Amino acid sequence: MDRSFCIAPMMARTDKHFRYLVRQLTKKAVLFTEMIHTNSILFGNRNKLDEYFQIENPIVLQLGGNDPESLSKVCQMAENYNYDEINLNLGCPSPKVKSGNFGAALMNHPEIVQRCLVAMQENSSKTISVKIRLGINDNDIDESLDDFIYQLSETGIKVFYVHARKAILDKLSPKDNREIPPLNYARVKKLKKDFPNLEIIINGGINDYFNQKKEFSELDGIMIGREAYSYPRKLQNIDSNFYGIADANRSLSDITKNMFDYFETLENQNDMKKGLIHMHGLYNGLKNAKK
């Protein structure tokens, strides 16, 4: 799978409706589900794994959790679905994640992460990857990050999505954790030099991605989050700029029509409302868009 351009997993953002919209704009960008905790699948709604469309590939299922057995069970279940990759979230900084000891909190427990990753790989034929931060709280982002990457890679993991910031779990909100900890792109680039056999995709604060593409050329890809959600029209030129194939070149009116045709297939009124919310960004920056 070519990870040159990826759209980050975002809670309440990257659901199947937004991903359907994105596929009107780019065929090749790698899409992620929202993070789904293993318990919500095993003890809640098992249909969560079925919330995608065949047109979405390439698509990555992102899981949250810290129990090898639970993760292995969900990986077994995911074998019945057409996901291209399964990603373990080790970067989410929310208080709920911290109290549950998953997400970024697991960066302080590499031995648990190792057991989880071994279990996932033993129970899936799909690529298993991780999404991490540079560290958490007072972690040293030099030696401790290298040690963490090495320990995870020893399990056979080859694909790392790296948010180029620390996560401050005790003092900052998730929103502040996306903005206040300083970006350190140089540290991510050094990871690639130190671990050339690993696939390193950079994430965090990348807004002008067409012009920043050259800045990250030594890495294996870039991952965009809020910018892609807020201004999805910019995604129309991803395929030509990052993959060397023709863009879809759909007009705004065609995209809008396709989305409303899709909405008509939805049986749940709440699903339609969610889908309409995701469309707001299509019109950002256009004259009279707020009308």
Predicted region positions:
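Short, hinge-like loop/turn segments at secondary-structure boundaries
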Residues: 48-52, 104-106, 146-147, 178-180, ...
